[in-house]
Curated annotation (Swiss-Prot):
Major site of localization recorded for this protein: secreted
Membrane among keywords: no
GO molecular function per UniProt: identical protein binding
Pfam families (alphabetical): EspB_PE (PF18625), EspB_PPE (PF21856)
PTM characteristics: Cleaved in the C-terminal region by MycP1. The exact location of the cleavage sites has been the subject of conflicting reports. Further in vitro studies confirmed that Ala-358 is the primary cleavage site and Ala-386 is a secondary cleavage site. Likely translocated as a full-length protein into the periplasm, where it is proteolyzed by MycP1. Proteolysis may serve to limit the secretion of other ESX-1 substrates.
Region (Disordered): 92-116, 303-335, 405-441
InterPro entries noted in UniProt: EspB_PE, EspB_PPE, PPE_sf
Keyword DNA-binding: no
Protein name (Swiss-Prot/TrEMBL): ESX-1 secretion-associated protein EspB
Family statement: Belongs to the EspB family.
Localization: Secreted
UniProt domain comment: The N-terminal region contains a fused PE/PPE homology domain. The C-terminal region is disordered.
Keywords, alphabetical: Acetylation, Secreted, Virulence
Amino acid sequence: MTQSQTVTVDQQEILNRANEVEAPMADPPTDVPITPCELTAAKNAAQQLVLSADNMREYLAAGAKERQRLATSLRNAAKAYGEVDEEAATALDNDGEGTVQAESAGAVGGDSSAELTDTPRVATAGEPNFMDLKEAARKLETGDQGASLAHFADGWNTFNLTLQGDVKRFRGFDNWEGDAATACEASLDQQRQWILHMAKLSAAMAKQAQYVAQLHVWARREHPTYEDIVGLERLYAENPSARDQILPVYAEYQQRSEKVLTEYNNKAALEPVNPPKPPPAIKIDPPPPPQEQGLIPGFLMPPSDGSGVTPGTGMPAAPMVPPTGSPGGGLPADTAAQLTSAGREAAALSGDVAVKAASLGGGGGGGVPSAPLGSAIGGAESVRPAGAGDIAGLGQGRAGGGAALGGGGMGMPMGAAHQGQGGAKSKGSQQEDEALYTEDRAWTEAVIGNRRRQDSKESK
């Protein structure tokens, strides 16, 4: 059983925070980096950045869904506290009876990251260590020379700073305390930590792009240019006498080219950026809808034809007080009080046929009619359960008969005449004398009144 606790709640603060948490954050960059040159290592590096950026965007989208779930939980908590306020008001209206429970948080919600996977790794194979000198220079000089990589890096660096500046929404609450508040604040802090980590990964990916761009600049500076190589070859062809001096220069170019290509192949191999899955948001379900109340005890169940009359008898469902009374002038002046008392005691009547009407009326004397003390309401034809009002009415009918009998024995309950004459009871009439229903539920006392327990046994 949940233990009651004192909580501090500002419902509007929770609702405002839900709107804050759910508000869209900055969109990640969508720039696609292109290779700075035609070297295989450069192409692989650019492709790795594309895959990492795509996965970052997918993880960020999953994080947005979790923030929406968190906002929904906050709204559900605020709504629940609103209903708790109503329950508290009801409890106060009920003379302070009843308790109000603090809203508690449930388990985590659904997993929006179920489809997320690690970032694929691109193959790191590059050009062979030996490549034609002029072909290597041509490939190195073809492309945007790292311009798109620099733009890509700038975009993700800016995004990193934007994310870091947008975590205030995950702060704690000023006017909400309790178990649910603690759980929600923990979930908010998890989201904050995850956003900060995604910001760091954004900066790391930007550094990778910057590094490849700088690596390419270094390679261009260290590698012989295509123009230099073509000029050297032309000089070699046109000046046979200078070939002995030209060959060592060409060999040096080749050596420099191989060194640059080796460095490019090794250093351009990037690690994939693998973001963590967003933490699942805390789940607080909406308050259940109010339960529909059944028949209120004391209200009669109307017949199916809507007439308010018991089928087959033409009589109202509640037995009527007999119009005849004692020779002294009918019912006493305090009839209403006696009927109310009788209604309370009627609920305690046993099904024992030995109960006499005098036990209700309080007076002795007079013959007890052999017929049942209830009204003729159709007998076995009535198949519906008796409501509390029926029971109270039954008590009223018996009270009237008892009062008349106590005064002089002249009164007779309605319906008694048609049951037959004589002092002997048949087996069937004895069964009809048995109580059809005994009300013994404490929660109906507000309708039929308080009574002493086990009155039926004491009155025998």
